[in-house]
Amino acid sequence: FIGVLIVSSFVLNAEEGTEVESVTIIGTKDDVKELAGSGSVLSNADLKKQMDTDIHKILSAVPGVYFRTEDGYGLRPNISIRGTSIDRSAKVTLMEDGILIAPAPYTSASAYYFPTTGRINSVEVLKGPASISQGPSTIGGAINLISTPIPEANSGKFIQELGQNGMVRTHAYYGGNSGNLGALVEVHEHQTDGFDGIANVGGDTGFNKSDVMFKARYESGNHSLTLKMLEMNEKSEQSYVGLSQASFNKNPRLRYGMTQYDVMDNDGDQMSLTYAGSIGNFDVVASKWSNDYHRDWFKVDKANNTKAHGVSNGINSVISAANGGNANAQAILDGKLAVQVKLKHNNRFYTNEGFQFKVSTEVGMHALTVGYRDMEDSESRYQEYECFDQSASGVNSALYSCGTGYTGSNNRLRESEATSYYIEDKITLGKLAITIGHRSEDYDQVENRWDDGTPTRTQLNSSYPKTKDGDYTSTGFGATYDLNANMQLVAGFHEGMTAMFGTDPETADNMELGLRYSEGMSDLEVFYFQSDYESLKAACTNSQGGACDDGDVFDGGAVDVSGVEVSGSMIVEGDNGTSYPIGLTYTSTDATFANSFDDDGEYWGVVAAGDDVPYVPDSSLALVAGFVTSNGLSGNLRWVKNGSSCSTASCGINQTIDAHSFIDLNIRKALNENVDIYMGVENLLDDEDVVARAPKDGARSQKPRTMKVGFALNF
């Protein structure tokens, strides 16, 4: 990539660089107060303080956002906003530069792909009625990740990090303008050997991830046309299999020997063409995009032991049995009983392409915006099996074909089409601003399935193809009132939805009341929110761990969610030019089922009215305190505490997740105007808590105490 940067620097004359704004849905921190609802902007300066590569940690600075750690690196995040289902972030609208980024936002929204956080320039989060413009999921909100923008003048950056467990991260970009043309080349490489050990057999548990991005822009007067291309690859030795509670108590950073062959292979490419400009009194942004993504997660599916050892075959059942005290189940996990282990290629190809535009204009007291999106996406599966033999001494054989009947299962092709539009009118009446919004969604899907066990997808199941469709219209309004130059009241209501196929959409009525205060170097926001679900819906996934078929939808009935969000920041000026920035984020949440039911353990299990919604903590707190000196030395200490939650509504033994926390430290020194060096320590106290019991009901701990050092060169 160094050669590419050199070529770019030859083409563009070097100058001091400032960056051109990318496509955003909010803008700057100052633009948040213009929202008819709650929102947050985390700037590039915010992200630079900790140099995080885990989106979970970045979002800890945003109230109302919850997360469930899985691999310790944030490779496949689980994010919830204001109580939405957390599994694979499927109920949050995810975007990069304003374009939907989930592998297949309608067909399969689960975020097995998530943009590489280390290359992201800034982050926007929308909640409340403000999110009605950013479907398809509008109950909780939307997250927009802003990629590195093209600099106005020629400039670049080179970042190099080294850390424990063989961690190496390289991030470099260069770009600029020459006449009407601008361009940017960016490379991000990140790898580590991982922090978990594999019992009996050893091996790495890390990843190797690479992104290459190119942008080009042509500008003429008030018009610009931007081409963006991205290619990404990932290989990660990650497993779905967590630990039984007994194993966790002995060594929380262990992987079972049977997971030796577990590996995720990802690759994909993205391309978008975006027009932005003014035509008369109209501001127009229009984008055409095409995203292709492939992933094959080869991982333990079953331990074929029912006849020999009397334990159900599914790995989720084995862990559950071990948690229930079954000695044979624990022995299988420990590699002390001989079993045949079956692994499945969770092999999927995704497409996501479409066109969208937004037109804005002002007429008197009205600021009108109209948006439209027409898109199609798909998910194609072909899932083959392979097997190996685990001996009673914990030694694994080589992989071999499982034989007849294990060629493949759940092989399918799902293709969806969707159109949506929204209309928004912001009416300004002096200190009062009222925003009224309307959104409409129309979507349909065709699904084909092939018979299990066939070597190729040649024998179409007699029950297919099947066609499913749905539509939904929603309205919302928000209002802001400026009490004075420093204080603003906010109120809003909106009907939210999440598209579902084969059943009615998930719907909820949502309201919020808030207060914003800003004066000098102090800011404070307090919001109360409430979501009344008519029907909480969830689609079965492999990561969820229920006894259900992947893709089936389960109705959780009425659910009540309410809470309080607080965020504040201030800068205290000290002596000798030293300042002390302090930030606080707090969320208190009550999310409970309103009805009692039992789905025979397929997804929700046994639910009693008043049970908590899984993985929504009762509270979350993030406190950041730092210092900035006049000689270029700065530092930040971050303490994040997540309250207790449960992995299931019934919250039985070994299904609780107690309150847990971590502390991160970052020290930075500017050697001159162009060179910074820094040091970071994650999980400073090396806490070893249960932070999740998924995927597959297994207990998981947070990343251990880990140190890294790095430098950043601006040129």
Give names to the regions the model predicted:
Residues 99-127:
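Short acidic/polar hinge/loop motifs at secondary-structure boundaries
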Residues 534, 641-648, 665-715:
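C-terminal beta-signal and adjacent terminal beta-strands/loops
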Residues 362-365, 428-434, 443, 553-649, ...:
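Gram-negative outer-membrane beta-barrel transporters
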Residues 350, 362-377, 403-533, 573, ...:
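Structural signature of Gram-negative outer-membrane beta-barrels, strongest in the C-terminal barrel
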Residues 20-50, 75-78:
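N-terminal periplasmic "start-of-domain" segments of outer-membrane beta-barrel proteins
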Residues 60-99:
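Extracytoplasmic beta-strand/coil segments of soluble accessory domains associated
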Residues 274-278, 283-301, 482-492, 507-597, ...:
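Membrane-embedded beta-barrel scaffold of Gram-negative outer-membrane proteins
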Residues 155-157, 162-191, 200-239, 263-274, ...:
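Transmembrane beta-barrel wall of Gram-negative outer-membrane proteins
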